[in-house]
């Protein structure tokens, strides 16, 4: 059994404790090796411009196939409504045992990474995958340990993701042959049946969303950036509402594009990379993100290549949910360490598909609580399996599929943070104007960015009823 690649670092915790007996094991392989493995295994091809391009059997998340083990730890602490579906420990153990047996003799990839840039609050995670491209995605998206940290790496959480393993709903107690099961007592996530790489990061996001509130830390589905004067802004929103785009502002330094924690001293990124939606992306409107789609090391998910092998970002024939996964270092204007101070502005993004909401509104504390709990927006085509038209949705906390606790816990914690910090709260419409989707037009990026910049300086703007 091969246990190392040329650039691999020997971690202190391999995978024998799980009973896994792979035919070949790649521990912490680097970018060059993962390109070679992904191409050899037929997972993808290298675009003429450099990125690794892949196609997946599912082109979005599968929130209806996600389950949490109900046991003594979670029975009273998880909100068993909406997206939080219970499953028994026996079902989890049975599926894990079947996965371990299925993986025997197969080729596996392991990345040892951190979730979180704050050394005090991060968690070390062991990500075991069947696909080389998933391993590159994980390397891009999570925080990579130093060589010294790898020498003594001890994972607190483990993710085992084998897309070719499919559950039998009649036997295994799942909804379909796809499953994402979270076990807080065993500190483990197992997944099968889906190649969509976003499940890897969202699974751990859900773990942090459960763990951090108990420490007084507000976990957030938001992007964050910081101005020259140190003023931090947060952008809450569902997938496709503009979090990544607006946070990558040439005039401000990027902290992160999707997942953050708010402590008593500031904010920190949960990730080490970005996962940008790139359909119809242009170099003129979004030069920083566009450039990542041309870089070696980037993973392009479900992006079509033209005859010359160049990514065609305007082609949505596979899905509207085309994605670019890249290390945050590919963005030139980033905040060192991906941490910032106490936020001064909190922006709620909503992609109103009906042309009703105003472009910019300042919210009162009561309005903030209402908007955060209701989380009105529209699901954008492609971000979830089966969503082909914008659909009005009320996603609590701007991330209901990832929030294991009761929404009230998150709302009270956010209200406490906002009150203590004196941050201003805004509602910005990134959706349609002049009519609904298909009739009007979407707010231009430049206009939306100007609105969000205005919010940083509009101290004179009082809250208004919306």
Curated annotation (Swiss-Prot):
Its EC number is 4.1.1.49. It is found in: Cytoplasm. Keywords: ATP-binding, Cytoplasm, Decarboxylase, Gluconeogenesis, Lyase, Manganese, Metal-binding, Nucleotide-binding. One of its GO terms (biological process) is gluconeogenesis. One of its GO terms (molecular function) is ATP binding. Its cofactor is Mn(2+). It catalyses: oxaloacetate + ATP = phosphoenolpyruvate + ADP + CO2. Pfam families: PEPCK_ATP. Binds 1 Mn(2+) ion per subunit. Its main location: cytoplasm. GO terms for cellular component: cytosol. The keyword Manganese applies. Belongs to the phosphoenolpyruvate carboxykinase (ATP) family. Involved in the gluconeogenesis. Catalyzes the conversion of oxaloacetate (OAA) to phosphoenolpyruvate (PEP) through direct phosphoryl transfer between the nucleoside triphosphate and OAA. PANTHER family: PHOSPHOENOLPYRUVATE CARBOXYKINASE (ATP), PHOSPHOENOLPYRUVATE CARBOXYKINASE ATP. This is Phosphoenolpyruvate carboxykinase (ATP).
